[in-house]
Curated annotation (Swiss-Prot):
The keyword Ribosomal protein applies. HAMAP family: Ribosomal_bL31_2. It holds the Pfam family Ribosomal_L31. It comes from the Bacteria. It comes from Vibrio vulnificus (strain CMCP6). This is Large ribosomal subunit protein bL31B. GO terms for biological process: translation. Belongs to the bacterial ribosomal protein bL31 family. Type B subfamily. Keywords: Ribonucleoprotein, Ribosomal protein.
Length: 86
């Protein structure tokens, strides 16, 4: 690797705010916030909304179920215009 062109790779604490879960992962992410971890060391800190702890694919749970499809929504919105017969 060429020296001086690659970002610093280090451990970063990610906080999944939707389920209040913390985990440490190696990353090149740059942040000004820090947090003291369980091992007593200070790491960069970054908040996220979705991770493997909260994503429906990994948890097997659906959060929001869409009641209508896009076509049904379109038909409902534009039904008032009726159909034109030529």
């Amino acid at each position: 690797m060429k020296p001086g062109i690659h970002p610093e790779y280090r451990k970063v604490v990610f906080h999944d705010t939707s389920v209040d879960h913390y985990f440490v992962v190696g990353s090149t992410l740059q942040t000004d916030r820090t947090i003291e971890w369980e091992d007593g060391q200070t790491y960069p800190y970054f908040t996220i909304e979705v991770s493997s702890e909260s994503h429906p694919f990994y948890t097997g749970k659906q959060r929001v179920v869409q009641k209508e499809g896009r076509v049904a929504n379109f038909n409902r919105r534009f039904a008032q215009f009726g159909s034109r017969e030529g």
